[in-house]
A protein has these predicted regions:
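Conserved nucleotide-sugar donor-binding
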Residues: 169-184
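Short beta-strand-to-loop acidic/aromatic patch adjacent to the donor-nucleotide binding site
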Residues: 113-125
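Active-site nucleotide-sugar/metal-binding loop of Leloir-type enzymes
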Residues: 99-116
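A conserved acidic beta->alpha catalytic loop
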Residues: 61-70, 89, 124
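Conserved donor NDP-sugar-binding/catalytic core segment of glycosyltransferases
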Residues: 92, 125-160
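Acidic donor-binding loop at a coil-to-helix junction in glycosyltransferase catalytic cores
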Residues: 191-198
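Non-catalytic, C-terminal membrane-associated alpha-helical segments of glycosyltransferases
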Residues: 233-316
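Short, acidic, metal-binding catalytic loop of nucleotide-sugar glycosyltransferases
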Residues: 45-54
C-alpha cells in the first residue's frame, strides 16, 4: 500500500496555547476519511475549538478524489498538530477498510506520550468541551477503558437514546491507552460490526465501556449510505449479527421489536432476520473466537432477562 505523509508547512505554531493540549491528560485522534468534502470542515472546526486540544490528529485519506485533501491541508498550514496521510484510490468501499486505515493511522502517529486515543469520523459536529468532558468520565472511573458520546443523525430526535449504554459506535470510540493496548488493537470484520467487537473485547479484558448519554454529537451524513438501499442494508445487518456471534433468541427478539419502528415496517425486520438465518443455514465462516461468542451471548441473554444493567460491569 502506497502512502504519503503530508507534513505541515509551518512549525512555528506547534506549541501555541499548550494548556489546551493537556500536558497531563493528553490525547491523540485518528480519522479515516474518503471523499467527505461536504462534511470534513465541520469536524475540523469542532476539533480546533476544543477547550482541550489533541496533541496530534492524524487524518488518513483513503484515496479521496474530491476536495477533502485540499480542505485538510488548508488547516494544516496553521494547526501543525493536524497531519494527513494520503493513500492511493481503491475501487470498492468495504467495512474492513475503515479498520485497516484507522490501524495504519494509529501506527503512523508521531506522538508517543499520550493517555487517551480517540477514533473520530469525518462527518461529525460537537460541542467545544466535548473531549474535556469525555476525559472527565475517565477521571471519575479508574476502570473505564472505552467511552464515547451519542451520535444522532441530523433531523432525528435527541431525546430518544440507545437502550444499550455499553457499546460505543466506532465513529466516536475513545480509549484509555491501557485498554487499547490490552485488546491488541482493532479487528477488521468484513461484514461490519468491528466497533461492537472492540467494546466486547474491552469488557472481556475487565474494562468498563460506556456510552456517555449527556454528550450528544451531530451526525451530519446518513449512515451506511454507500452500501446499497435500505433492504440490502437490512439483510447485511443480519449477516453482520451472525458474524458477531449473536444469540439467535436475542436476534429474534431484537427484530421483533423493530417490526413497527423502522420503515418499511415489518418487511425490514423480516429481511434482517433472513440475513441472519441464511448465514446460519449456510454456516458462514466467522472470524471471532468461541470465547468471544460465549461472552457476547451471555451479555445478550443477561439483557433479555434483566440480569445485566445497561452499563457493563468488569469481570471479577
Amino acid at each position: 500500500m502506497h502512502s504519503e505523509l503530508t507534513e505541515p508547512q509551518s512549525t512555528n505554531l506547534q506549541f501555541v496555547n499548550s494548556d489546551r493540549h493537556g500536558q497531563y491528560s493528553g490525547y491523540v485522534l485518528v480519522t479515516p476519511v474518503r471523499n467527505e468534502e461536504n462534511f470534513i470542515k465541520n469536524t475540523i472546526d469542532s476539533v480546533i475549538k476544543q477547550t482541550k486540544l489533541p496533541r496530534e490528529w492524524l487524518i488518513v485519506s483513503d484515496g479521496s478524489t474530491d476536495e477533502t485533501n485540499t480542505i485538510i491541508e488548508s488547516y494544516m498550514m496553521k494547526y501543525t498538530w493536524i497531519k494527513l496521510l494520503k493513500l492511493k484510490p481503491r475501487k470498492y468501499p468495504c467495512f474492513a477498510a475503515v479498520v485497516k486505515n484507522a490501524t495504519l493511522g494509529i501506527n503512523s502517529l508521531q506522538t508517543e506520550t499520550y493517555r487517551y486515543l480517540g477514533l473520530l469520523d469525518s462527518d461529525l459536529r460537537f460541542q467545544a468541551d466535548y473531549f474535556e468532558k469525555l476525559i472527565g468520565e475517565f477521571h471519575k472511573d479508574a476502570n473505564l477503558g472505552l467511552a464515547g458520546g451519542v451520535a444522532v443523525d441530523i433531523g432525528h430526535s435527541k431525546e430518544v437514546l440507545p437502550r444499550n449504554r455499553q457499546d460505543v459506535p466506532g465513529a466516536l470510540q475513545f480509549f484509555r491507552r491501557e485498554c487499547f493496548e490490552a485488546i491488541d488493537g482493532l479487528t477488521p470484520i468484513p461484514e461490519g460490526g468491528w466497533d461492537s467487537v472492540t467494546c466486547t473485547t474491552a469488557r472481556m479484558k475487565g474494562f468498563t465501556t460506556r456510552l456517555v448519554t449527556h454528550l450528544i454529537v451531530d451526525h451530519l451524513k446518513p449512515r451506511n449510505t454507500i452500501y446499497g438501499g435500505v433492504l440490502k442494508r437490512k439483510w447485511q445487518l443480519g449477516v453482520r449479527d451472525y458474524a458477531l456471534g449473536y444469540h439467535p433468541i436475542f436476534e429474534f427478539v431484537k427484530c421483533a421489536g423493530r417490526l413497527f419502528r423502522e420503515k418499511p415496517y415489518i418487511i425490514s425486520s423480516i429481511v434482517w432476520i433472513s440475513g441472519f438465518l441464511y448465514s446460519t443455514i449456510t454456516n458462514r465462516k466467522r472470524l471471532i473466537s468461541n470465547e468471544f461468542i460465549e461472552h457476547v451471548r451471555s451479555e445478550q441473554m443477561g439483557r433479555l432477562t434483566g440480569l445485566r444493567t445497561v452499563e457493563s460491569r468488569p469481570q471479577t
